[in-house]
């Protein structure tokens, strides 16, 4: 019998990139591209339909895992069908409080593009543009930091 070792990753620090999203005109083509380039794994997330049911829309969403991921919950990002040509790669930064970080960011010149929203059973996020127009997201985990 082989002994197994469970690897525990340290909790990321505030401001760490913890998630990214890739909008794709052709999700199958783009998932194939990144699978071949980096070995990433793409798994359809059924939770996206549940989340978006409350928002009166539907969304096909694939969770992205590193090629060496040992659990389907060990994700690094997501892929979805692009809705508008303006949608671009979006990075999510971990924060202790979306509300506090939104206030600070707007004081520093950021523009709120999407107000704070809940991701059921996971946390909250908001999307902003920095003073130069670069889009990014804040993410607060329900599990805390």
Q: Over which residues does each language-model region extend?
A:
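Residue-level hotspots at or immediately adjacent to binding/recognition sites across diverse folds
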Residues: 19, 48, 55, 78-80, ...
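Short hydrophobic/aromatic beta-strand element in the GNAT-like acyltransferase core
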Residues: 61, 76, 125-127
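Short acidic/glycine-enriched loop/turn segments that link adjacent beta-strands
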Residues: 50-51, 55-60, 85-87, 119-124
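Short, charged/polar, Gly/Pro-enriched secondary-structure boundary elements
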Residues: 70-75, 132-136
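Core segments of cupin and vicinal oxygen chelate
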Residues: 11-14, 21-72, 107
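Active-site beta-strand termini and strand-to-loop segments that position acidic
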Residues: 64-69, 128-131, 141
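Vicinal oxygen chelate
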Residues: 25-28, 91-135
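N-terminal beta-strand motif that seeds the catalytic metal site of vicinal oxygen chelate
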Residues: 1-31, 41, 88-91, 141-145
């Amino acid at each position: 019998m082989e002994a197994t070792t469970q690897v525990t990753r340290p909790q990321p620090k505030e401001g760490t990139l913890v998630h990214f999203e890739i909008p794709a005109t052709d999700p199958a083509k783009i998932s194939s591209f990144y699978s071949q380039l980096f070995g990433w794994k793409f798994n359809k997330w059924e939770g996206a339909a549940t989340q978006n049911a409350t928002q009166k829309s539907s969304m096909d969403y694939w969770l992205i895992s590193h090629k060496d991921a040992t659990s389907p919950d060990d994700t690094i990002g997501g892929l979805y069908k692009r809705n508008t040509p303006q949608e671009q790669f979006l990075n999510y930064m971990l924060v202790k409080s979306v509300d506090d970080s939104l206030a600070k960011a707007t004081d520093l010149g950021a523009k709120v593009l999407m107000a704070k929203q809940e991701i059921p059973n996971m946390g909250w996020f908001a999307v902003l543009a920095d003073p130069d127009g670069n889009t990014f997201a804040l993410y607060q985990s329900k599990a805390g930091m």
